[in-house]
Amino acid sequence: MYLKAGDTLLLEELLYGLMLVSGNDAALAVAHCVSGDTASFVELMNETAARLGMRHSHFSNPNGLDAGDHYSSAGDMAKLTAYALEKEAFRRIVSTTSITIGERYLANHNKLLKLYDGCLGVKTGYTKAAGRTLVSAAEREGLTLVCVTLCDGDDWNDHMALLDYGFSLCRMETAAPAGRVLASVQVRGGSSARVPLMADEDLRYPLMGEEKLTVVAETPVSVPAPVVPGQVIGKARAYLAGEEVASVDLVAAAPSARVEFQEESSIFERFFG
């Protein structure tokens, strides 16, 4: 990124320099901005890797240059990318084809942004030890796939072929769309004895071949009044081969007002008084 002493940039601007043009100076600046020094940031990197289950990775610097005890795997990079793509800011940055920051014009090194329909970008890389490395992601019909290659001299073509293959195998399955009523719950002391419960958002998960999802609604036996529409009352969980793979909140689809004691008394007197 060709930073100079005295330059002042926003953290997000440094991230553009890091992700679009592989600015090693930007990586060091981010490390100092976030953690105060490089060593503390590297410690944070390794803590995050452990939390994400990246068992074949260990980092010793923030910029990814060859160093002792600094390594990763394609699988671990895929895990990290899947986590990062959940962040809207990350998606926006890595999918940017070019940006001007002050007097700096940054053009994304990732050619797939222009070559492959639905490409979200992510990151190119090269070192003597690793060779050409590339992490890419693409989205079609709500399904996002991540592709990682290491030491690949024909990575652009390989990624397009691998992503095509992945999309031919996978589909995004909606087990329960937002708004679908999946259960009901008893309301104690309410104007309605029960209220329906619906999925707060789409319950979705990617599947391959003949795989099927099983949906289980988990609700309490009863809840106290009042109940208002949109109130979270339970969970809808999706299972694949007996393993939970996704969940969404179950919310009240209708209200149930609290019946006050005086109202209960008047009803009693109406029938028995």
Regions found by a protein language model. Name each.
Residues 54-58, 66-71, 75-273:
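Domain-terminus/edge residues, biased toward the C-terminal soluble/receptor-binding domains
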